[in-house]
C-alpha cells in the first residue's frame, strides 16, 4: 500500500481561505450584476407596452416605471441568496403597482394582455448568466 501526500502551493491555499471568508459578499455582487441586466430589459419592455395599442389616449403617469427596481440580496432559510425585481408600493393614489402590472401583463376583460415580464425573463437569461459569471470571475481574481 502506498501513501501519498499532496501539498498545495501556499498562494492557492490563501486564495481558497479568502474566498471562503468572502463568499457571501461575492455572491451578492454577482446577483446584483445579473439583476441589473434583467431590470434593464424589464424597463425597456414596460416602456414599450405602456400606452401602446389602446383605443384611447394613455393616462400613464410614469409612476409604474419609476417604481420598478431591485430588492436587496436576501438569504432564505435554506441558505440560498435571492434578489427580486419588482415594484415599490404603494402608489401616490393609493392603488397597488403590482395590481396594475398584473393587469398589463395578463390583461383583463376588454383589455388584451401585453406581456413585459415573461419576455424579459426569457430574452435576458443568457446575458444575465454571463454578467454574473463575469462579475464572479472579476471578484475571484481580485483575491
Name each model-derived stretch:
Residues 1-84, 92, 98-143:
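Short, Lys/Arg-rich flexible segments
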